[in-house]
């Protein structure tokens, strides 16, 4: 952030600083183009990544957080469509590496690996200017990503 360089682009034309109205309007347009759908229980946006981007068809679900009326954080979840407990090739460990490579291609930078002393918390982090991306395993089938605008964040957990 000391460089003063800003990276407001998140993905699919969604940007930090968008109002809720602009976000909904943009998603409505993406939906009309057939690029996105409503996610589970209508609580998220669903985007399907195909095998040209991932090892297996993958769902990406997202819904932003807004602070002072502006998009400041984008929590994202990824899961292979064909995931099953008996299919180790599609475990969250494999998915994590797929998502890591995808995001490195999208954002043009690399992640660094971090863990706490007792190795109970492990994640990959990428910071470019104001945009921080944290990547982690949520459970056996799901990888989480948290894309945050460090200029707009006030209170973090």
Regions found by a protein language model. Give the residues of each.
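Acidic helix-start/capping segments at beta-turn-to-alpha-helix junctions
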Residues: 37-49
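A short, structured loop/turn motif at beta-sheet edges
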Residues: 65-72, 106-107
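Short acidic-hydrophobic surface loop/beta-edge motif
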Residues: 47-51, 124-126
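Short, surface-exposed coil-to-beta transition loops
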Residues: 55-61, 120
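Non-cytosolic coordination micro-motifs
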Residues: 1-40, 78-157
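Hydrophobic/aromatic beta-strand elements that line small-molecule binding cavities or substrate pockets
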Residues: 60-65, 135
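Short, cysteine-centered beta-strand-loop-beta hairpins and adjacent loop/turn segments enriched
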Residues: 52-56, 82-85
């Amino acid at each position: 952030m000391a460089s003063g360089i800003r990276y407001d682009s998140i993905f699919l034309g969604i940007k930090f600083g968008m109002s809720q109205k602009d976000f909904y309007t943009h998603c409505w347009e993406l939906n009309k183009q057939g690029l996105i759908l409503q996610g589970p229980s209508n609580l998220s946006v669903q985007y399907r990544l195909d095998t040209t981007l991932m090892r297996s068809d993958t769902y990406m679900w997202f819904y932003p957080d807004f602070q002072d009326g502006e998009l400041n954080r984008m929590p994202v979840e990824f899961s292979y469509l064909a995931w099953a407990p008996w299919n180790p090739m599609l475990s969250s460990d494999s998915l994590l590496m797929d998502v890591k490579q995808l995001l490195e291609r999208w954002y043009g930078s690399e992640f660094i690996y971090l863990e706490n002393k007792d190795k109970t918390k492990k994640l990959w982090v990428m910071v470019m200017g104001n945009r921080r991306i944290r990547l982690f395993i949520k459970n056996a089938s799901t990888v989480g990503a948290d894309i945050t605008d460090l200029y707009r964040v006030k209170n973090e957990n």
